């Protein structure tokens, strides 16, 4: 349960139709195996104690009595199990038969939830036997000493070790309807929905089922466990595939191979779900819990080993097709944002500083797209290259080639002499390569860009990316400042893919060659003199790998996770790539710089938001510039 993770399982025992004795023996074995594998929430299919396909045998008292007796037997047999288990059965109460899910924990039947929506169409004819369940809870006598609450408005909460875990139940058809019970469950506080199902298999139904479960988990910001009937059910008219699904907020974490009765496992991140709900004020505004009852279940505190995939590049889709689509979309957002700003200001000239590095390259590509959308000539893009003390031949030549290939107007201003004069004016020794030496060059370049823009009634286009802004890796009032920053919410790991996508799709071989070489060039501000003609100042040697910092940024900003949890996730994501000492070193650097450099982000120029994470002080990050990082650093100091 550490860090809010809970391991769950969807189980499909092979049933024998109308044999509760054999079925409960098999359920016990399957549940015990799932628990042995660490599952703490275990879900079995709809009516699994009897089998779903009993037909008119559901009207036989012998079957109903046996199902009830075997439920009690199963609860006792699983008494020592450290888990909460959900099983399905038919249950008579006050003259009506209900299709129910029973929750078992520590030898007790802690609650019963009836099915709300009873299908009676096509191959389904449940209304022949079952009645819709009531919302309000009422007591049901299952057996002596087993007086159990039953109702659809019941939630089960893990009070002791993981209070964020609140479970709501729906049964099969319930989720296929326009108004699933899980909606009101979630608004009443349920963070995990379990669905005991018997969904038969027809061509293409698995795709719809998967999207339905994933979509419901996204809509409700919850985890969702879907356990469906499989092999063993009657095939008189239909076939059941045992299609089990575990989803979390729109993402399928685990899914069984159909027709195998496979148990699937995953860990659901309850803290992540609670974080999402905390941020979405409209979710809380719709909450309603006054008519719900909560019953506690208990599991022992334990450390959950993570088997779920942790993406080392959360900003970048792993699938090439999805990645290309994302890149196309982001370039469109960036260029449309700039297009609107140029239209509003009636600027027909843009000024971009071109270094031959990734960020300025992307900014120029976006500016070109904006001008093309406006049907303005590219010659009105003033691409300014400003060689300084650290400029290498490679970046200089790439800058010139890039400008030429894109058809922008080249302006070259060598800043070395102007900076030397400035150093003399302020008494700076040129041989002392300190922060003044570096920032003096950055501010000189910004001054040149601003003045060229003023001279030509133009707009300075900012090049800095979100990763640099998160770390404060920008000169205040130097490259930090512009009139519109097109890269302001694009992380460095994504910048690389955007440029690569453009190179792959532009259809210009010469331009592609230049872009590929830019991609191959080490990231550097080039403010220190080169060594033997090569870049001496490499950003990632100084502040750390951007793939780590983007990973940290994502989980800090997107979910507000604590350092310990982010460290744990990074260990999983970067296993075999970075050792723990390296991950921890740069995690410290990230937090220290993220807090100390907020003053730079507090006065950022406008720029378009492209993803769920952004650092604009007017939108996503309203953080005080003088906040203390102490408690975060204290937590990091205790990590190993």
Where are these regions (language model features)?
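Enzyme catalytic cores with a strong preference for nitrogen-chemistry domains
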Residues: 1-351, 369-378, 410
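ATP/NTP-dependent adenylation/nucleotidyl-transfer catalytic domains that generate, transfer
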Residues: 163-165, 222, 234, 248, ...
């Amino acid at each position: 349960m550490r860090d809010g993770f809970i391991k769950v399982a969807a189980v499909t025992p092979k049933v024998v139709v109308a044999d509760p004795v054999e079925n409960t023996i098999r359920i016990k074995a399957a549940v015990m195996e799932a628990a042995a594998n660490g599952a703490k929430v275990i879900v079995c299919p709809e009516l699994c104690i009897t089998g779903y396909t009993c037909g008119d045998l559901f009207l036989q008292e012998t079957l109903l009595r046996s199902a009830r007796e075997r439920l009690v037997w199963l609860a006792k047999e699983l008494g020592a199990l450290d888990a909460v288990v959900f099983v399905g059965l038919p249950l008579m109460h006050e003259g009506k038969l209900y299709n129910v899910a029973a929750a078992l924990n520590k030898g007790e039947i802690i609650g019963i939830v009836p099915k709300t929506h009873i299908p009676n169409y096509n191959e389904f004819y449940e209304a022949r036997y079952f009645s819709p369940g009531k919302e309000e809870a009422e007591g049901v006598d299952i057996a002596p000493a087993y007086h159990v609450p039953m109702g659809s408005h019941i939630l089960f909460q893990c009070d002791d070790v993981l209070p964020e875990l609140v479970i709501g139940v729906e049964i099969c058809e319930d989720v296929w309807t326009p108004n699933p019970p899980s909606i009101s469950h979630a608004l009443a506080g349920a963070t995990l929905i379990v669905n005991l199902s018997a969904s038969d298999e027809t061509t293409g139904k698995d795709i719809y089922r998967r999207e339905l479960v994933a979509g419901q988990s996204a809509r409700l910001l919850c985890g969702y466990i879907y356990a469906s009937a499989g092999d063993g059910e009657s095939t008189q008219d239909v076939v059941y595939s045992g299609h089990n699904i575990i989803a979390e907020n729109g993402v399928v974490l685990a899914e069984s191979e159909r027709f195998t009765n496979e148990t699937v496992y995953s860990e659901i991140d309850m803290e992540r779900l609670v974080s999402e709900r905390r941020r979405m004020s409209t979710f809380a505004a719709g909450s309603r819990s006054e008519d719900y009852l909560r019953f506690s279940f208990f599991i022992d505190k334990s450390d959950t080993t993570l088997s779920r995939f942790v993406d080392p590049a959360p900003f970048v889709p792993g699938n090439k097709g999805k990645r290309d689509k994302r890149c196309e979309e982001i370039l469109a957002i960036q260029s449309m944002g700039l297009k609107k700003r140029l239209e509003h200001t009636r600027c027909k000239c843009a000024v971009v500083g071109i270094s031959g590095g990734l960020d300025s390259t992307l900014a120029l590509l976006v500016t070109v797209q904006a001008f093309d959308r406006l049907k303005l000539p590219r010659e009105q893009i003033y691409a300014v290259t400003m060689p300084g003390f650290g400029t290498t031949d490679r970046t200089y030549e790439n800058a010139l080639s890039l400008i030429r290939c894109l058809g922008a107007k080249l302006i070259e201003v060598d800043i070395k002499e102007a900076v030397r004069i400035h150093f003399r004016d302020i008494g700076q020794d040129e041989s002392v390569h300190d922060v003044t030496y570096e920032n003096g060059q950055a501010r000189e370049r910004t001054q040149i860009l601003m003045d060229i823009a003023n001279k030509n009634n133009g707009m300075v286009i900012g090049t800095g990316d979100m990763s640099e802004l998160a770390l404060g890796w920008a000169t205040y009032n130097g490259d930090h400042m512009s009139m519109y920053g097109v890269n302001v919410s694009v992380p460095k790991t994504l910048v690389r893919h955007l440029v690569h996508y453009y190179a792959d799709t532009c259809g210009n071989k010469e331009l592609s060659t230049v872009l590929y070489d830019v991609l191959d060039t080490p990231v550097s501000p080039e403010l220190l003199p080169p060594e033997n003609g090569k870049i001496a100042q490499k950003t990632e040697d100084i502040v750390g790998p951007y793939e780590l910092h983007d990973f940290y940024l994502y989980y800090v900003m997107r979910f507000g996770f604590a350092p310990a949890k982010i460290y744990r996730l990074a260990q999983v994501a970067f296993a075999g790539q970075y050792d723990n000492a390296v991950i921890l070193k740069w995690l410290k650097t990230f937090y220290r710089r993220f807090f100390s450099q907020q003053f730079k982000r507090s006065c950022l120029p406008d720029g378009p938001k492209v993803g769920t994470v952004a650092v604009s002080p007017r939108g996503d990050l309203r953080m005080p510039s003088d906040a203390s990082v102490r408690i975060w650093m204290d937590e990091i100091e205790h990590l190993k």
